[in-house]
Amino acid sequence: MRIVQIIDSLEIGGAEKMAVNYANSLAEKIVFSGLVTTRREGNLKSQISNKVSYLFLERNKTLDLGAILRLREYCKDNKVEYLQPHSSSYFTAVLVKIFLPKIKIIWHDHMD
């Protein structure tokens, strides 16, 4: 399995911590575990395992085509099969899926 967690930032918070924990735990059990931060890095970056592939997109607007294309290339280069966006990062995952329709999305909503 080749899976990437997608989260808006690595500031300290519940969804952010869960994304880091998932990426770290999966890195011990599967072929490829990645973590992509779309908008901001933060204090949780230091907790990412060196076994996790990390990408910071530096996305600065809702529809940042450059960031989407960088994520698409990252997914292609790493043969990613699953995207697991957390909360509002779902939109980013859907845009990547338009370019890479074989990728499956597992949405993790933290609102309820």
Q: Which residues does each PLM region occupy?
A:
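Membrane-interface segments of envelope glycosyltransferases acting on lipid-linked substrates or membrane lipids
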Residues: 1-112
